[in-house]
Amino acid sequence: MVDVLNIESLDLEARGIAHRDGKVLFVEGALPGERVTVQTVRRKPSYEIAKVEEILRPSSQRVAPRCPHFGVCGGCAMQHLAPAAQVAIKQRALEDTFWHVGKLKPARILPPLYGPTWGYRYRARLSVRVVPKKGGVLVGFHERKSSYVADMRECHVLPPAVSRLLLPLRAMIAAMSAPDRMPQIEVALGDEAIVLVLRHLLPLTDGDIAVLRAFAAEHGVQWWLQSKGPDTVHPLEREHADALAYTLPEFGLRMPYRPTDFTQVNHAINRAMVSRALKLLDVQPQDRVADLFCGLGNFTLPLATQGREAVGVEGSKALTDRAHEAAARHGLGERTRFATLNLFEVDVQWLRGLGYFDRMLIDPPREGAQAVVQALSLLAPGERPRRIVYVSCNPGTLARDAAIMVHEGGYALRSAGVINMFPHTGHVESIAVFESLDEATVLQAQAQARQKAREEAERLAEAAAA
């Protein structure tokens, strides 16, 4: 059955949203404001999934996708939408999530942070599959909503130097001893080097090593090898062990890293994000600052150039060791401290043990920082950071954590905005600023939170006894 629908909005999977007979329809390929005919492909009790058959009235924001693989490849979802409109949808999603999850509205919306629209992805994981029906070896991202590997010949979100490697990599893998036992190639670009990490499930032969070296010489790349877990990653050539680094020119910093370390995908946006975060924190020379989930010290080292001391805490000792080395190399050893700790299990006693911080930066993974913000919310007015900047890659956990800080801890959500870290995708990176309110407001929020917790405990006890 073909229906005619008016598309009202867009979700973060780039599906148009419409309503019919009290039911939500998610329409693949449709944009807000468009009138389309659709074919339903899946029916559920509360919603349907459909695909566009014909666009009767196109959106003024619709653009021609640059990539010939768009719609099949799962690497991008929004190439058919103008970049500014993509960011507007992400901003709306952030604001909606704050309200629906936390009943919060930022006092101020920060202007979006923009960067390169194409060629921005300096880190990627490419899958490798042998598919005889498609001509042999495929190297690329997965197909949209599928475990199959897309038949990619180019990629416009990868830097051109990497996009040009997709077809040569196919031929190289095909020439090796066990192409079907090499499932993955990770790509990591520094400011001066391209590193490829080959995952191989069988030992490489001398012939395989020769093939890798010939490819590296021809294409100007460096090979690292991974036979098992992350601890087995090592450079094919020993002299390449310290090849990767990115820079933060505003702060005079060079940050070395290994190809499997976590670094931001988009180097240009990362520089802008660090700059904005420090401006929002407004660190003073006498301030002591904490950087939680600090990784390689992406924020810690810039903070140390401005404050009295920066303390970075991270769950990976390998990362904190590299952060410490980078700090020492830049003469910041006496103004930085690093600790290795699982920040998903901390409590208020641990937080107090770190001492007083004037400012705090929190940059967690997608799981958010629930344990950290619960501990923060229990701190007395005189022992808590006055200002906190929270960098997030998941609006849902940011909104959850913000609700704890505001409703239970007496913080105010002063501002928030999106960072366009991943153009053409539904990923939403954002930044939010919290400030501690006056003592009376903090104590009132904490008292109300304790009362609510008591009432919930009593309710659960009554339910268990019934």
Swiss-Prot record:
Domain TRAM residue range list: 1-54
Family: Belongs to the class I-like SAM-binding methyltransferase superfamily. RNA M5U methyltransferase family. RlmD subfamily.
Superkingdom of origin: Bacteria
GO molecular function: 4 iron, 4 sulfur cluster binding; iron ion binding; RNA binding; rRNA (uridine-C5-)-methyltransferase activity
HAMAP family, per database record: 23SrRNA_methyltr_RlmD (MF_01010)
A Pfam entry, by short name: TRAM
InterPro entries according to UniProt: 23S_rRNA_MeTrfase_RlmD (IPR001566), MeTrfase_TrmA_AS (IPR030390), MeTrfase_TrmA_CS (IPR030391), NA-bd_OB-fold (IPR012340), SAM-dependent_MTases_sf (IPR029063), TRAM_dom (IPR002792), U5_MeTrfase_fam (IPR010280)
Amino-acid positions noted as binding [4Fe-4S] cluster in the UniProt annotation, renumbered to this chain: 67, 73, 76, 155
GO biological process: rRNA base methylation
Enzyme class (EC, first level): transferase
Gene3D superfamilies hit by this protein: 2.40.50.1070, Nucleic acid-binding proteins (2.40.50.140), Vaccinia Virus protein VP39 (3.40.50.150)
Key words, A-Z: 4Fe-4S, Iron, Iron-sulfur, Metal-binding, Methyltransferase, rRNA processing, S-adenosyl-L-methionine, Transferase
Active site per database record: 393
Protein name as it appears in the record: 23S rRNA (uracil(1939)-C(5))-methyltransferase RlmD
Keyword 4Fe-4S included in the entry's annotation: yes
Parts forming coiled coils: none
Function: Catalyzes the formation of 5-methyl-uridine at position 1939 (m5U1939) in 23S rRNA.
EC number: 2.1.1.190
Record-linked NCBIfam families: PRK13168.1, rumA
Chain residues that bind S-adenosyl-L-methionine: 264, 293, 298, 314, 342, 363
Reaction catalyzed: uridine(1939) in 23S rRNA + S-adenosyl-L-methionine = 5-methyluridine(1939) in 23S rRNA + S-adenosyl-L-homocysteine + H(+)
